[in-house]
């Protein structure tokens, strides 16, 4: 056997060390790269899931059909808002522009106590939202006006904001703002929706910061909304709801394509 010199031994040790170092670097690279790839695969999945939850809610609401005898409202997401109170950016309101059919879209309000107010006299409303046909009907012997100009964000919660939703001290509220009005049944407005509006008013009057979103749900190209999706959450935890309210009226049937209506004494709303 040939005896290795000390110089040859050093060369061999150096070569082995290099190989080990290269292998270690590769393994280290893989150890770093694989968790990164795994994480990058998880993040889009989570984002898609979060986005689809909201979209799924709206898709399901679009598919709902009210039948005589049903309840006028139902909870969405078990009645819990999906809004994030930590993203409050107010006081302001973000209105949607009118769409190609001239229909109103969602409005998201970031409200405080300074947005609550009352005025001694309200200006008249001249704007006619899509589907506006408020001719009186005789229902069960009574004269009924089936529609209201419904506010997405209630008039008394829009003080000190202009019609674009930006802060403007001294403004007396959004009365006749096309981006805040839709054709709403008088029953859903005055009996049902008003209950939730009062919950929001109570919260901001107590000093809470409230994130509040309201969206009319239209089907296809219909001019009158089938319902109203409303949710709100406060920074103090005193307010949290998520509800869908059908745009219906006892004793009245609406043609949602046009907003016209006819009396039907057998049409029931619970």
Where are these regions (language model features)?
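Polybasic, low-complexity association/targeting segments
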Residues: 68-117, 243
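N-terminal Sec-pathway targeting helices
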Residues: 2-15
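Hydrophobic membrane-insertion alpha-helices, especially the h-region
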Residues: 14-29
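Domain-level detector of nuclease and nuclease-like folds
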Residues: 104-270
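N-terminal, intrinsically disordered, polar/charged segments of Gram-positive cell-envelope systems
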Residues: 31-91
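Alpha-helical interaction segments
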Residues: 16, 55-56, 78, 122, ...
């Amino acid at each position: 056997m040939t005896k290795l010199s000390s110089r040859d031994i050093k060369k061999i040790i150096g070569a082995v060390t290099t190989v080990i170092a290269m292998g270690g670097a590769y393994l280290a690279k893989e150890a770093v790269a694989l968790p990164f790839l795994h994480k990058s695969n998880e993040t889009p999945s989570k984002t898609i899931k979060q986005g689809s939850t909201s979209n799924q809610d709206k898709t399901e609401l679009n598919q709902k059909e009210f039948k005589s005898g049903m309840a006028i409202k139902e909870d969405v997401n078990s009645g819990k808002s999906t809004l994030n109170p930590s993203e409050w950016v107010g006081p302001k309101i973000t209105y949607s522009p009118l769409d190609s059919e001239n229909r109103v879209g969602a409005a998201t309000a970031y409200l405080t106590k300074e947005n609550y107010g009352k005025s001694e006299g309200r200006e008249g409303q001249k704007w006619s939202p899509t589907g506006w046909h408020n001719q009186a009907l005789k229902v069960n012997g009574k004269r009924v006006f089936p529609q209201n100009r419904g506010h997405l964000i209630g008039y008394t919660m829009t003080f000190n904001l202009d019609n674009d939703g930006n802060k403007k001290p001294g403004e007396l509220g959004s009365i006749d703002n096309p981006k805040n009005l839709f054709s709403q049944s008088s029953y859903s407005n005055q009996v049902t929706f008003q209950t939730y509006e009062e919950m929001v008013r109570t919260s901001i009057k107590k000093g809470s910061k409230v994130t509040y979103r309201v969206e009319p749900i239209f089907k296809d190209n219909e001019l009158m909304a089938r319902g109203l999706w409303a949710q709100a959450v406060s920074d103090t935890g005193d307010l949290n709801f998520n509800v869908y309210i059908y745009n219906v009226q006892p004793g009245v049937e609406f043609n949602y394509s046009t907003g016209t209506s006819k009396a039907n004494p057998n049409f029931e709303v619970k």
